[in-house]
Amino acid sequence: MALTEKQEALLKQSWEVLKQNIPAHSLRLFALIIEAAPESKYVFSFLKDSNEIPENNPKLKAHAAVIFKTICESATELRQKGHAVWDNNTLKRLGSIHLKNKITDPHFEVMKGALLGTIKEAIKENWSDEMGQAWTEAYNQLVATIKAEMKE
């Protein structure tokens, strides 16, 4: 299902707030992932030997920021472009990494829950069910693109 103009506006409005503190929001995203699914830390080499989210881990900080920024920026561009705007090499890499790490639907659902939780916490009183639906739809479209590449 394509994003509506209103959903696109909600994504962009919230992204304006989120991008003001990508380091904090990206670490929060990973904290929520590990909280919801502690076993998921074994997917990330830089978290395997840790019992908590090491906020001073430079590899985690860098990776988390890239993931968070990529998801959010891609989500805000979906309606305008009509699809995820990843180039072919990026898409192949995303498919390959997710396939290699045996990422399945439950993993994607944990990520979605963590993403929505992170955004809701950051947006505070500006959060709405409509905003949540917009982010859910955008995330689902991005994941569908990755899953399609995983099958190739």
Swiss-Prot record:
The keyword Plastid does not apply. InterPro entries: Globin, Globin-like_sf, Globin/Proto, Leghaemoglobin-like, Leghaemoglobin_Fe_BS. Phytoglobin that reduces nitrite to nitric oxide (NO) under anoxic conditions (e.g. during flooding or in waterlogged soil) and upon root nodulation. Required for general plant development and during nodulation, especially for the onset of symbiosis. Monitors nitric oxide (NO) levels during early phase of the nitrogen-fixing symbiosis and buffers oxygen in functioning nodules. May not function as an oxygen storage or transport protein. Has an unusually high affinity for O(2) through a hexacoordinate heme iron because of a very low dissociation constant. Belongs to the plant globin family. It is found in: Cytoplasm; Nucleus. It catalyses: Fe(III)-heme b-[protein] + nitric oxide + H2O = Fe(II)-heme b-[protein] + nitrite + 2 H(+). Binds 1 heme group per subunit. Its cofactor is heme b. GO terms for molecular function: heme binding; metal ion binding; oxidoreductase activity; oxygen binding; oxygen carrier activity. Heme b binds at S45, K59, H63, R93, H98. It is an enzyme of class 1 (oxidoreductase). This is Anaerobic nitrite reductase HBI.
